[in-house]
């Protein structure tokens, strides 16, 4: 089993290569605009480090959101092209799954930009609801119960992808998960 997994939904870029029981990973801060220039060279470096050629990938995974609109589009587009070219099986991962990894309950929060927040309620290890919280309403969030970080994103992504692979939890098409309209869509409504 050779699987490439990518997360471009936040200011941290993460790429993981799973090859049987081995894991190779690269994860670093890129800010708000570094994903597009780094994704393909980083994937190439990671594959070279693992001694795996693109054509040998059995699976490809991507975090589909929520998160940065541009980041989501970059990650989904890049891995979709690879999946089409290789015929690799596709695994979609939700950003909240990464935050929920190894947790049982609480409120998960992701920076939505401009002071807004994407939230999810976690009960018994399952996400039971999600919500987009505007800046003006963020004061109502239960600060003492909010989780904004998980264990290592590499660890969470590695384990979630391995589990989905074992469960044959594949998708035909990567669907970006946006919890709100893009800035351009919101501007067109004015």
Residue ranges and their predicted role:
Residues 50-55, 84-93:
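Phosphate-handling active-site elements
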